[in-house]
Amino acid sequence: MERATGPGSLARTLLLPLLLGLVAGTVTARRTSDLLAPTAEAAFGLGAAAAPTSATRVPATGAVIAAEVTVEDSEALPAAAGEQEAREPEPEPEEEPDIRPCGRSLVIISTLDGRIAALDPENHGKKQWDLDVGSGSLVSSSLSKPEVFGNKMIIPSLDGDLFQWDRDRESMETVPFTVESLLESSYKFGDDVVLVGGKSLTTYGLSAYSGKVRYICSALGCRQWDNDEMEQEEDILLLQRTQKTVRAVGPRSGNEKWNFSVGHFELRYIPDMETRAGFIESTLKPSGNKEQSKIISDVEEQEAVMMDTVIKVSVADWKVMAFNKKGGHLEWEYQFCTPIASAWLVKDGKVIPISLFDDTSYAPNDGVLEDEEDIVEAARGATENSVYLGMYRGQLYLQSSVRISEKFPTSPKALESVSSENAIIPLPTIKWKPLIHSPSRTPVLVGSDEFDKCLSNDKFSHEEYSNGALSILQYPYDNGYYLPYYKRERNKRSTQITVRFLDNPNYKNIRKKDPVLLLHWWKEIVGTIVFCIVATTFIVRRLFHPHPHRQRKESETQCQTENKYDAVSGEANDSSWNDIKNSGYVSRYLTDFEPIQCMGRGGFGVVFEARNKVDDCNYAIKRIRLPNRELAREKVMREVKALAKLEHPGIVRYFNAWLEAPPEKWQEKMDEIWLKDDSTDWPLSSPSPVDAPSVKIRRMDPFSTKECIEIIAPSPHSSRSFSVGISCSQTSSSESQFSPLEFSGMDHGNVSKSADAVCQLQDSCLTDCEGEDGTMDGNDEGHSFELCPSEASPYIRSRERTSSSIVFEDSGCDNASSKEEPRMNQPPVGNHYANKLSALRHSGSKSSEPTVSVSPSRPTTLSLDLTKSSVGKLQPSSPKVYLYIQMQLCRKENLKDWLNSRCTIEARERSVCLHIFLQIAEAVEFLHSKGLMHRDLKPSNIFFTMDDVVKVGDFGLVTAMDQDEEDQMVLTPMPGYARHTGQVGTKLYMSPEQIHGNSYSHKVDIFSLGLILFELLYPFGTQMERVRILTDVRDLKFPPLFAQKYPREYAMVQDMLSPSPTERPEAASIIENAIFEDLEFPEKTLLRQRSRSMSSPGAKHSRHSSSPHSPLPSN
């Protein structure tokens, strides 16, 4: 028996531990099954008596919800979306799930796949538990498909707002209705769409630190688990899910056209019964009011700080990170497999929302910063991004921290009003300036085993991550875009970011960039520096310090012409001229008209006086070279179109206009022939190639604004010289004019040759006072004339010499105002130009004694040798097209010249001045009645006919040539107070609204009329005085003499110069003013003292001058 019982006892001893282990395993399995959440059948009594021991996912129908809780250990990897593998948790002490450690914190994360996870921030971000409620993802939509809305795409936001993306315009706009407004609106959306759907709220009661589902409440009711075993001291997390679903179906077929569903979670913390003092409600209270539906607002956001650790969420990288607040280094991070929708920090009985859009970055300690600039760039978190555009399973969605759509009212009727044509609904716009979340565009993927496993289990995420899915996200290495919300659209943040380098303990770890040794490149560096200095000096001198001989202001009567042809060279190209003659081109101007004289030249071109060969009457012909650009050409055509529509006694009469496009160099050659033709009364002639003069431009005074141009024409027949002086100075006024031109001759036989030199100079040099560089002719013999003689130059009297003067009152190139007047002491000359030159005087000269202008030599000399053929090498850049305008012939003397010739109050009779002004006002009133405005009224634009009738002219031609950037006409249609902001016209006569660039109307002409009336009644002694007084009058500061002598005119001028356009009178009321009623205008006024032209059929035209401004002896 002892032998038999010995082995048996040994066997029983060995089997006893095995039985005990089997019993312990059974108990452990039961306890594990208690930890698992029940399924939907057990929750709502759908046929299951008890919760199964394994978590299974049941498709959500209606409000059926399944839940799965996974308790993680330190070795477990994060659970992937839709993961079905069984997890066997490691046995833990029995008291750990039940007893909550003091001061324990949790980071609760909600992801787009509908799962809830808890991380332990005190244990390096270890996942504490993971819950799948089984109700599907938070976002689902078919609105992004191109076949739904064409080029427009509707992108839902997780909080229920809708945004519209326009592919063509690349703009993001907020749709003026939300999901709730869609549900509240009528069930019929248009004629072919019916809206169905609803809003569901589901509340989950979870154990804060174990993840157990205690109860689930929805519209179908509530279901509880383990009420008996539930401990009162355990903390509860109240998780509420709001899901909004809208479906559009066809009313006849019932087929679904599009749908979308968005949802989000809200978290509250319910502490145990003993720690009610730590209870703080969530910032969100469930309500249908949109103003109360904010989860996080800018004011309410607070940084998730735990001791010295800051919790941050990277939406684009799906990461939760913890940074050390003092050092700024990364302590731990956790990578999720799906995008993060919301995040909270549960700490000390409080729920602190974690901002998903906080740009404040913390640099990890192991990543050493390169320089101080990197630190500043890393700490630039002063602003937040407002909207994040991401993608989940091929579906675009938006997350926003600032509710942009709350600033705009939403209406259930918004859908109907959008379809109406007259509806005006302001749509907020998010500027499409996406900020890619990655710091660099370099396509480098950082390897992550955990993230790769997530992608391998989710084909949608993998495809989305690899190819960017839709057209908005084309860059394959970015998961989304940040759309910034600028500071001017929101209140200033209370948080201020301060960067302190000295107080940072890690400042010593900053690695300075290695210096680059450039010693062996010193030659290249020095050469580059020298080259830059030389180039900069040259450019500055050329641009800002032009040649002193070219420093000359342009005046409105400056001798300019558009047919700037080359000077006559010593060796003419006969072959090219023969080709032009044989081209067969016939000019209409030469066919119908006979040129008489040059009336003047300016920025607009050339004005001729010509006699029509058919009716034998004289007309003014304007010849303008049209610019090549189409827009500028249209501006030049303004005057033609304006004059053709205007027929009034006070406006220059228009007869005809035509275009001519001569062959290359044809116009220049024909000008030479016209100048050489003595049969016409043309004051300009061309010198022969042998007598081609040389031009010398000199500055007479280094402190003077005048220039000297001396032309020396060599002559083999005479040793005496002939000089001419032209003052090219300009006053400070914009209305300045050239000083007269003086001729002083040495030999009467050479007067015609000198006149030829003058004419050639004006056609080639005086256009812009420019010319090709040439050598100075050193021959002392020959004919010369000097422009702009020095005021200090001595005048030498000589009995052997005779003198004559030529007056250029409007333009330096017009000497045709002369008249043939025989002189007693002048010998006969074969050439008829001698008679013309002997009859011309300076307008301000009081003596007829002969004078000679002597110019001392100056070092700054620019000589233009016109005998060189190199000048003729210039070729026109494009074919020239000329516009000819035939219009009424007026006097050369305009109102500006008339005012300058009468510098005293006695010389300006009140009745004459008011008569002139009344005629101007009548012309302006006619313009305004036609819906037009002049915009450039000034004395130089007021002309006189041969019968002393005032004419208003220059309807925008000068403006069109000088202001290419102005797109509006000077004669502009005037529908009431139209908006015109172009700064055109002379600034001295411009209204304040024109100068300031504000909108203006036809009242700008009234302002100019007021200044003209004042200038008519109040003479000025000098141009400086004129500018100063007119500037004061613009500010309603009148001279006392004017107010005393003309009280009624003073009151009218005050009204016309009112700063407010509405207070200025109309032109019609000005004409009807009482000051014009008691005046008797004589049939022939003092205007007859001005120069007038007389012509008779068959006789050459001559101009007589009897003005006191330019007295000439009547010998």
From Swiss-Prot:
Q: How is it modified after translation?
A: Oligomerization of the N-terminal ER luminal domain by ER stress promotes EIF2AK3/PERK trans-autophosphorylation of the C-terminal cytoplasmic kinase domain at multiple residues including Thr-981 on the kinase activation loop. Autophosphorylated at Tyr-619 following endoplasmic reticulum stress, leading to activate its activity. Dephosphorylated at Tyr-619 by PTPN1/PTP1B, leading to inactivate its enzyme activity. Phosphorylation at Thr-802 by AKT (AKT1, AKT2 and/or AKT3) inactivates EIF2AK3/PERK. ADP-ribosylated by PARP16 upon ER stress, which increases kinase activity.
Q: Name one Pfam family in it.
A: Pkinase
Q: Which GO terms describe its biological process?
A: angiogenesis; cellular response to amino acid starvation; cellular response to cold; cellular response to glucose starvation; endocrine pancreas development; endoplasmic reticulum unfolded protein response; ER overload response; negative regulation of translation
Q: How does it sit in the membrane?
A: Single-pass type I membrane protein
Q: Where is this region: Insert loop?
A: 647-887
Phosphoserine-modified residues are where?
S715, S1093
**EC number, as in UniProt:** 2.7.11.1, 2.7.10.2
Membrane topology, Cytoplasmic segments:
536-1115
- In this entry, the parts of the chain located on the Extracellular side of the membrane are 30-514
List, alphabetically, the CDD domains matched: Luminal_EIF2AK3 (cd09768), STKc_EIF2AK3_PERK (cd14048)
Q: Which residues are listed as membrane-spanning?
A: 515-535
Protein activity control = Inhibited by HSPA5/BIP in absence of stress. Perturbation in protein folding in the endoplasmic reticulum (ER) promotes reversible dissociation from HSPA5/BIP and oligomerization, resulting in trans-autophosphorylation and kinase activity induction. Inactivated following phosphorylation at Thr-802 by AKT (AKT1, AKT2 and/or AKT3). Inhibited by ATAD3A at mitochondria-endoplasmic reticulum contact sites, providing a safe haven for mitochondrial protein translation during ER stress.
Its catalytic activity?
Answer: L-seryl-[protein] + ATP = O-phospho-L-seryl-[protein] + ADP + H(+); L-threonyl-[protein] + ATP = O-phospho-L-threonyl-[protein] + ADP + H(+); L-tyrosyl-[protein] + ATP = O-phospho-L-tyrosyl-[protein] + ADP + H(+)
Judging by the UniProt lineage, the source's domain of life is Eukaryota
Q: Which residues carry this modification: Phosphotyrosine?
A: Y619
GO molecular function term, any single one? ATP binding
What results from changing W165S? Answer: Decreased binding to misfolded proteins
The protein's location, in the record's own words, is: Endoplasmic reticulum membrane
Q: Give the compositionally biased regions (Polar residues).
A: 845-860
Database matches in SUPFAM superfamilies = Protein kinase-like (PK-like), Quinoprotein alcohol dehydrogenase-like
* Positions bearing carbohydrate: N259
Q: Which UniProt keywords apply?
A: ADP-ribosylation, ATP-binding, Endoplasmic reticulum, Glycoprotein, Kinase, Membrane, Nucleotide-binding, Phosphoprotein, Serine/threonine-protein kinase, Signal, Stress response, Transferase, Translation regulation, Transmembrane, Transmembrane helix, Tyrosine-protein kinase, Unfolded protein response
Domain comment in the entry: The lumenal domain senses perturbations in protein folding in the ER, probably through reversible interaction with HSPA5/BIP. The insert loop specifically recongnizes and binds EIF2S1/eIF-2-alpha.
Known partners and oligomeric status: Forms dimers with HSPA5/BIP in resting cells. Homotetramerizes in response to endoplasmic reticulum (ER) stress, leading to its activation. Interacts with HSP90B1/GRP94. Interacts with DNAJC3; inhibiting EIF2AK3/PERK activity. Interacts with ATAD3A; ATAD3A and EIF2S1/eIF-2-alpha occupy a common binding site within the cytoplasmic loop of EIF2AK3/PERK, leading to prevent EIF2AK3/PERK association with its substrate EIF2S1/eIF-2-alpha. Interacts with MFN2. Interacts with TMEM33. Interacts with PDIA6. Interacts with LACC1.
Name listed for the protein in its UniProt record: Eukaryotic translation initiation factor 2-alpha kinase 3
Question: What species is this protein from?
Answer: Bos taurus (Bovine)
Q: Which gene encodes it?
A: EIF2AK3
